[in-house]
């Protein structure tokens, strides 16, 4: 036994931080699948089958939100508890959670563990990582707690004290982690998400704010806390906030115009309801996975536009996915510099390094390649779906969004396996999988 433990320890010590991160996520997914496959996890007391359990666990850990069965009507309280725990671990990153336990038992964080935290949080240097992790954990508790408190003002009167509190906590965590899992199937039918609350200001705005805060990233949140004035924020925070709010505003306007008279989506709502629903849908496209209108009923041009926004996704070091807002911002500035024939690429009078530009281009091209490859594969495994439906499900998986227009529950076995792989790739990061990081190696 000692020899086996020693061999495993030696093997782990030889691994790169990125490799350990990938394996760590895979192990958590496997444990989650085993727990969800137990009869105690379902309401009918029967095992769901390992494939669907694995699909759900992958979606939860990768904070995606694509589901094979309705969360509220199929899973028991135990099953729902497992799912939300997996979401919290996946949203914060397993190294952040590991650091939490290390801090609780007052264990010293060594250099190798700091490298793992650095990789998990996508930070440039090692200084202040443990302190940053503490801030992340405290900020998460504060934001999710406040969100749950606000949601409880609606859910407790509607569902009673115990169920209302549980629903508030579940949806606050799911929203902040940009997961998109919901328990509203008992209210408005399976797979209905938050459509019942399309006109509810409290639910819509609270969930939207949680999604935005989870999507802009912890470094930006901490920068906002430290510096009350926008002018004092660092360059990264300014770029993230500007890009995020431009995309949200543009997305809201686009959805409002295209769906304004669609009787199956915005057409039945008053003007205020149209604005609220358009805003929420634009926000949730930032990799959250909730919806307050029927996505399958949206016009094709709206769905195509949503694919673009989902592909862009959230910001670095956040709970969201996608190729990241900073990647798109960097590429736009690069194109602008090329058109104006400028030698340097600048933002806020600061020069963007060539390494950053290359990394952004690499992430973007890998994202496009995964999307095209995924669309082709799923169109072969599930030929009954249209190309637009396939593309929507694939980008939703790769960008860990979780929005669906009806495809996920009806995928074939092969289709589900490939979608799981795309969710996993989207969560651990395409650069982590495909590119080595020689600058991170400590000799």
Regions found by a protein language model. Name each.
Residues 1-443:
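Membrane-proximal intracellular helices of multi-pass ion channels
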């Amino acid at each position: 036994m000692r020899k086996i433990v020693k061999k495993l320890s030696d093997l782990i010590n030889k691994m790169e931080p990125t490799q350990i991160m990938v394996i760590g996520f895979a192990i958590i997914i496997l444990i989650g699948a085993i727990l969800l496959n137990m009869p105690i996890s379902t309401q009918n007391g029967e095992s769901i089958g390992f494939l669907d359990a694995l699909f759900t666990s992958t979606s939860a850990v990768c904070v995606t939100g694509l589901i094979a069965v309705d969360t509220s009507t199929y899973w028991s309280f135990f099953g729902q508890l497992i799912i939300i725990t997996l979401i919290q671990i996946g949203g914060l990153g397993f190294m952040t959670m590991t650091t939490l336990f290390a801090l609780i038992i007052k264990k010293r964080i060594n250099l190798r563990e700091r490298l793992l935290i650095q990789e998990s949080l996508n930070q440039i240097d090692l200084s202040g990582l443990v302190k940053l992790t503490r801030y992340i954990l405290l900020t998460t508790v504060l934001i999710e707690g406040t969100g749950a408190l606000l949601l409880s003002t609606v859910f407790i009167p509607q569902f009673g004290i115990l169920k209302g509190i549980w629903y508030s906590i579940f949806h606050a965590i799911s929203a902040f982690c940009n997961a998109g899992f919901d328990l509203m199937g008992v209210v408005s039918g399976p797979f209905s998400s938050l459509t019942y609350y399309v006109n509810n200001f409290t639910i819509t705005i609270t969930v939207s704010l949680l999604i935005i805060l989870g999507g802009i990233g912890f470094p930006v949140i901490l920068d906002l806390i430290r510096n009350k004035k926008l002018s004092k924020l660092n360059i990264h925070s300014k770029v993230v906030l500007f890009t995020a709010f431009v995309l949200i505003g543009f997305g809201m306007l686009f959805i409002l115009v295209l769906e304004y008279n669609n009787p199956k989506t915005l057409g039945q709502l008053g003007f205020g309801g149209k604005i609220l629903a358009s805003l929420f849908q634009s926000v949730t496209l930032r990799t959250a996975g909730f919806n307050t209108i029927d996505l399958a009923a949206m016009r094709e041009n709206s769905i195509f536009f949503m694919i673009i926004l989902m592909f862009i996704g959230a910001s670095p070091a956040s709970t969201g996915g996608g190729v990241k807002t900073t990647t798109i911002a960097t590429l736009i500035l690069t194109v602008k510099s090329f058109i104006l024939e400028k030698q340097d690429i600048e933002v806020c009078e600061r020069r963007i390094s060539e390494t950053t530009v290359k990394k952004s281009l690499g992430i973007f091209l890998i994202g496009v390649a995964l999307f095209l490859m995924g669309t082709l594969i799923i169109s072969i495994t599930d030929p009954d779906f249209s190309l637009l439906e396939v593309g929507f499900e694939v980008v939703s998986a790769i960008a860990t969004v979780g929005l669906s227009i009806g495809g996920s529950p009806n995928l074939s076995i092969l289709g589900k396996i490939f979608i799981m792989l795309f969710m996993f790739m989207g969560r651990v990061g395409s650069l982590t999988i495909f590119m080595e990081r020689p600058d991170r190696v400590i000799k």
